[in-house]
Amino acid sequence: MATARPLHRQRVESPSGAVSRSHAGRLLCMAGALLVAATAWASGVSVPIDRFEVSGNTLLPQACVDEALGTAGADMDVPAMQAAAQRLQDAYRAAGWGAVVVLLPEQQPGSRVLHLQVVEGRVSQISTAGQYRFSRDNILRSVPALQPGRTPRLRDLDRELLLANTNPAKYSRVLLQPGFDTGDVEALVTVEERPLRPWRIDLSNTGTPDTGRWRLAAQYQNPNVADRDMVLGVRAETSPERPSRVAVFSSTLRVPLYGAHTALEGALLASNTRSSTNTTTAGDMRFAGDGLSAGVRAIWLLPGLSESKSQLSLGLDVRRYRTECTLGDPGQAGCGPTGNNTQHALPLALGYTLYRPDSYMLNIQWVHNLPWGSAGRDSDYAANRAGADSRYQLLRLNAQVLGRLSPHWQLKWRLDGQVAPHALITAEQIGVAGSATVRGYEERALVGDSGASTSLELSTRLDTLLSQPVSDAWPTLSFFADAGRVSNHLGSPCRPGHSSCTLWSAGIGASWAVDNRFFLRIDAARAGTQVQETRRGDWKLHLGLTAQF
């Protein structure tokens, strides 16, 4: 009988969380080739096989092995034996075990048994490279699937890299390759640290005539609190023209739990907005609104080794909305209960996200409010809007598709929507006008219980289009068309005399990114529908400037 020898060896590449927008960060896995033996049987000669015998397996349940190999009892030639070994190899890969080799060793003629040898590669060495601000312990904590003496499971490693690469300050890849001895696997974790610019300033004209056209925000971010990859963010926003009328403060904390393939997110938000004084025959009228919110959300990364990724989320918020009105000498009494009201909300949100980097994203979220507190009754909600239900439910949808039409042109489609079966208070209604929805109109100029906005945008870099050297001085040009629609329950108007309203716009935009520190976006949109003070044919310029340092 001839000695066993490998007939071929191949390197298998597996998608992972290391996939970036450029698709350069793939997890390369030396899964091992299918090795077969050159036997004494001539090509085309079959021998009877009554059963399979597999040695070396500790990872797959016996039921999975039996299912992969099928039922024996037929004559098999060498290609059929190779196919059986390949089926078992595929079963390991399907279960996420990449560093496993199935061997077809030398067989004993006349035994009527097909012997298969499994070699489960185990990690013998773990190296890291590229990290400077992050410690080696930090990097290794983010990939607990890599443990000395254990076979790495690609399904787990894939999700760990996905979670690790949500950190804004680093990007990790893993390379698995054969070690010095048979069955050894050496792991190399390479880290690409991104520029650390903790401070960010945003300036945009997303305000209102009443509170000031401009909004100025300052943000601080720490991407590695306590060397545990916890990301802390703090943000404050106001109106530089009328700072006493707008104050928004928020804070977020994201905690990755790599072993559980889960991220926990916490958020705090406090806002206060005051309108200008309106003079009436009964005296000066002033409106003010404020909100408080605290929430937590858990995100589970679902297993999978394809290019598409998916996750589940479960969140719970505690919210308080308050509206105040004063009129003349009586103050709040002059506005009555409809002008002064408070609502407590405890919305529970369950979401599912499916996405492929640089290709598409789909998010579906179901929200159900749990009434709580002294202002969580139907009567409290009715004080804000007659007929509003404190046990409201929502179904939200967000989708995005990116496609490259040519080396120079890219097409992007976006959809954001909400469906509500009952009337909602103002704070929970959807807005479909403004810089992030339907451009060409004031922010939230059109709101409703249910609604959707969509956008189709064609973009290209001007320097590549004109065959010029790539430079930050050249902008990315975009041509877009936006549209939106809202509807209200109980006949509530979104425009005078209408409970269902539509709007649309079209325009052109330009954006610059300078040294990955300064970002400027300009959109000029022409309104196609009259909404409030915006007439059909009016043009509006949306500006956004960001500086990081």
Can you say where each PLM-predicted feature lies in the sequence?
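C-terminal outer-membrane beta-barrel translocator/porin domains of Gram-negative envelope proteins
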Residues: 322-483, 487-489, 496, 533-535
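Transmembrane beta-barrel wall of Gram-negative outer-membrane proteins
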Residues: 243-352
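Transmembrane beta-barrel strands of outer-membrane/channel proteins
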Residues: 176, 201-205, 216-218, 232-238, ...
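Outer-membrane beta-barrel "beta-signal"
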Residues: 220, 512, 537-549
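Periplasmic polypeptide-binding modules associated with outer-membrane biogenesis and secretion
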Residues: 2-17, 43-207, 236-247, 395, ...
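Repeated loop/turn-to-beta-strand initiation elements of outer-membrane beta-barrel proteins
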Residues: 172, 197-199, 226-232, 259-266, ...
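Residues that define the transmembrane beta-barrel architecture of outer-membrane proteins
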Residues: 183-185, 212-216, 245-249, 290-294, ...
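Residue-level signature of outer-membrane beta-barrel architecture
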Residues: 191, 222-224, 255-257, 300-302, ...
